[in-house]
Design a protein with these regions (language model features):
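Catalytic-site microenvironment of enzymes
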Residues: 5, 20-23, 55, 183, ...
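Sec-dependent signal peptide recognition
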Residues: 2-8
């Protein structure tokens, strides 16, 4: 009887080990399927790709259109406590730049989000963004350099400019010139996938 009970405990622990792992996507409109149905967005497309190879991972999309790094920082604790993610895809900063907010404050916010995530044993995948040159070269350079600086400082994986293969192609952008359209979403999913796969256990 004891052996049977012991076997059941071991089996339950094994099942728990194989339990579903959550990947939280913390982003802005780029990740929130802005201007299209949710199922057409890159997060949904990436989830479908993962299901074919890594079925125990599910994506939880916590992205909000208009979100800033400060907004993400204000929400991260609740997300970590409720979702208990294994990985956080951090795609924030673009709205900080578009509003002319301090790149130093943005860096501080992203750093704190990353540290809090790492403190629970989760991994951060940082998605870098760029902004139009409206605020001048110095501001744009300060903004963009935040991402590689953080990646090096915190030893996290960095996805180069997410919209690199999309932003300059009008047929892949919405009319506002800022948001990728539905045709571009598969490109974004394909861009992220090779950086994400090595992080999956």
């Amino acid at each position: 009887m004891f052996r049977l009970f012991f076997f059941m405990i071991i089996s339950l622990l094994s099942l728990q080990t194989m339990a579903e792992q959550v990947i939280v996507v913390l982003g802005d409109s780029i990740s929130a399927s802005y201007g299209m149905p949710v199922e057409q967005g890159w997060v949904s497309l990436l989830q479908k790709k993962l299901l074919t190879q890594h079925s125990r991972y599910s994506l939880y999309n916590a992205s909000i259109s208009g979100e800033t790094s400060a907004g993400g920082l204000a929400r991260i604790d609740v997300l970590l406590n409720t979702q208990k993610p294994a990985i956080v895809l951090l795609q924030l900063g673009a709205n900080d730049g578009l509003r002319g907010l301090s790149p130093l404050d943005m860096k501080s916010n992203l750093e704190e989000i990353t540290r809090r995530t790492q403190n629970i044993g989760a991994t951060v995948l940082l998605l870098s963004m760029k902004i139009p040159p409206n605020y001048g070269k110095r501001y744009v350079d300060l903004f963009y350099n935040v991402y590689p600086q953080l990646a090096q400082q915190l030893k996290i994986t960095l996805v180069p400019f997410l919209l690199e293969d999309v932003a300059l192609h009008k047929d892949l952008m919405q009319a506002d010139g800022l948001h990728p359209n539905a045709k571009a979403q598969a490109i974004l999913a394909d861009k992220i996938e090779p950086y994400l796969l090595p992080l999956l256990q």
